[in-house]
A protein has these predicted regions:
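Active-site-adjacent beta-strand/loop module that shapes the phosphate/pyrophosphate-binding cleft
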Residues: 136-155, 160, 169-217
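Basic polycationic patches enriched in arginine
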Residues: 2-4, 10, 140, 150, ...
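Charged phosphate-binding loop/patch that engages nucleotide di/tri-phosphates or the phosphate backbone
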Residues: 246-263
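Acidic, metal-coordinating catalytic segment for phosphate/diphosphate chemistry
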Residues: 32-72
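Polybasic/polar functional segments that serve as interface/processing modules
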Residues: 99, 105, 110, 134-137, ...
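NUDIX/MutT-family hydrolases
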Residues: 208, 212-213, 220-251
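Conserved Nudix-box catalytic region and its N-terminal flanking loop in Nudix hydrolases
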Residues: 79-117, 121-124, 130-132, 158, ...
Length: 263
């Protein structure tokens, strides 16, 4: 059972009068999405849809909302050449990893938890923004700039033993934008059965994060969500998907953005 939080909090302003205020996590998410620079027209359009929901629907982090927040985690290895996929039981297709917000506005934490719960892998979310890799500079997995003893800012979710397992990867300068949001998409979900109950058609207001993980860590399926897991070359995410819209609109985009990230 996940810890739950209200996306809006009631604050006593005196005289028995209460007003609803945005939680810090919801406000941060809105700020990150507002700062996000769309990669294409799909992201530009969907960014506005997601922001409208975040600013107007206090229930958008709950599954009861017709359009509700969800998150995905596009997970790559240290070379940025392989990604981790699951065989999704409902979609009957090889798929990225993700899940519902379920009342939690910190979607970064939700994404990392979904990755661990559904695959057994600990991930490290990489900053995105509009950053450009700094030519010739590499960062070790423990967050130390090669040739220096000065640590870079470290993701608090990254365990020491996990971080030490990474090879070096390009240092990236994200001062032009900042934030961790890698991709945005509004996803349609057709009605389906889950755990013996019918779930009506709805929309996922999806925020995707880019993460790095160690492919040598043993994979563990989550039988109520998936039935197989594997690391594959980036382009195989397109080849293996049986969902045309996801394949052509999302996976091709994610692959292009991944390759642009580490140029």
């Amino acid at each position: 059972m996940r810890d739950r939080e209200s996306a809006l909090s009631r604050v006593d302003v005196g005289g028995g009068v209460y007003v609803e205020t945005m939680t810090r996590d919801r406000a941060r998410l809105i700020a990150d999405i507002e700062a996000f620079e769309p990669f294409n027209e799909q992201e530009s359009v969907d960014k506005q849809v997601i922001l409208r929901a975040l600013k107007s629907d206090s229930n958008c982090f709950e599954r009861s909302a017709q359009a509700h927040m969800a998150t995905s985690i596009w997970t790559v290895d240290a070379s940025f050449e392989r990604t981790l996929l699951e065989w999704h039981n409902i979609y009957q297709s090889w798929s990225w990893i993700g899940g519902h917000a379920d009342g939690v506005a910190d979607l970064r934490a939700v994404a990392l938890r979904e990755l661990e719960e559904e695959t057994g892998v600990h991930g490290r979310i990489l900053p995105y923004g509009c950053g450009i890799p700094v030519e010739g500079e590499l960062v070790r997995g423990d967050g130390v700039l090669e040739g220096s003893n000065l640590p870079l800012e470290q993701d608090s979710s990254c365990e020491d033993s996990f971080a030490r397992g990474f090879e070096s990867f390009p240092r990236v300068d994200f001062r032009s934008n900042g934030g961790d949001v890698f991709s945005l998409e509004v996803l349609t979900v057709n009605g389906h059965e889950k755990r013996g109950a019918y779930v009506g058609s709805h929309l996922h207001l999806n925020v995707t994060y880019l993460a790095q993980a160690n492919p040598d860590v043993p994979l563990k399926v989550k039988p109520d969500e998936n039935s197989a897991l594997k690391w594959v070359p980036l382009d195989d995410a397109v080849r293996l998907s049986s969902e045309p819209w996801i394949r052509d609109r999302i996976y091709r985009k994610l692959i292009a953005k991944t390759r642009a990230y580490c140029r």
